[in-house]
Amino acid sequence: MKKVYLLLLTMFLILGTNESMAQSKKYSVYGVGFYNLENLFDTCHDAGKNDYEYLPDGTNKWTGLKYTHKLRNMSRVLSEMGTDKLPKIGCAAIGVSEVENAKCLEDLCNQEPLKARNFQFVHIEGPDQRGVDCALLYNPALFKVRDYKLVPYIYRLPQDSMRATRGFLVVSGTMADEHVTIIVCHLPSRGATSFYREEGGAQIKVVKDSLIADDPNVKLLVMGDMNDDPQDASMAKCLGAKRKIKDVGDGDMYNPWWDVLASGTGTLMYDGAWNLFDQIILSPSLLNRDNSKDYSTLKLFSHQIFRRDYLFQKEGKYKGNTLRTQAGGVWLDGYSDHLPTVVYLIKEQK
């Protein structure tokens, strides 16, 4: 099976536009994505969690039928992510947020589109009061997990001493025979002030700096629902995620989504305007900062917002918005209020 995947991953690309440069080379391409699943809850109460609205007798009347449909819809999207460039293969790894527990992830990975690729998951139960966590789904033929941990989000203000929220899931593994680490996060919502997201950005930077200090060559991706746009202080200042590759210093990161938002599109819509909260941010080790086309090690090749017609409302007041699972107390049998994002990493085959 592994040989089949590696064969399918081979791409023949022409680098450069000059005839003198037009040499066919062999490359392996890997998709890495992120998707906010928007409340993937099962129908059972988790002790100590405020999940009552997602019970059969809760405000959302969350029945087995609705849960089954949610699993089907999420697996469809997840299985299609990355297939624009990697047909029938999709992503090697996908970070997800707003999932209740390991049972939901097990049920999700047992859906046929994901089960066919033997998708596995990494999850650690977190302290969020609603019970929503982050996780990493991965195809073990393309990404091999070494170890993982959950780094807590730390509330520093005295008045927040009793609060707890989602931490930062850090997963280290091997992709293309290289050390790759993925940090999956879901920063505090916009119901809180920007201070808490700025704290989150600064805390991610501490984790990131520690990982790079341990291995300066690690290929590191920070991904998640940041509840902020690329230009906001949590990302641009506190995390140090730059808009242009030429401005990325050794201690910085690169945020390719800044220009995507500036072009007029995003991953979720609010009051008729796009935001781009769902970001995948890359360490300098994944960049060709000298404008070369050196792909002897894993490098960023391209990035995209994953869009399909079925992810959008087709009519009514909210035409053009994402088709949610439910809205205004009405079950829409949709997907999520967010769109997924994908980056493609490329490496020359020797």
Residue ranges and their predicted role:
Residues M1-Y27:
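Bacterial Sec-dependent N-terminal signal peptides
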Residues M21-E112, V122-C134, A202, R308, ...:
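N-terminal, active-site-proximal structural segment of metallo-dependent hydrolase catalytic domains
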Residues A22-S24, D209-L220, D228-K350:
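Metal-dependent phosphoester-hydrolase catalytic domains
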Residues S24-V32, F41, L142-K144, R163-H186, ...:
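Beta-strand-turn-beta hairpins that frame and shape the catalytic cleft
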Residues Y35-E38, S97-E100, H123-P127, N139-P140, ...:
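Active-site-proximal beta-strand/loop segments in catalytic clefts of secreted hydrolases
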Residues A93-G95, V99-H179:
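Structured beta-strand-rich core segments of catalytic domains in phosphoester-bond hydrolases
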Residues S194-P216:
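A long, amphipathic alpha-helix that forms part
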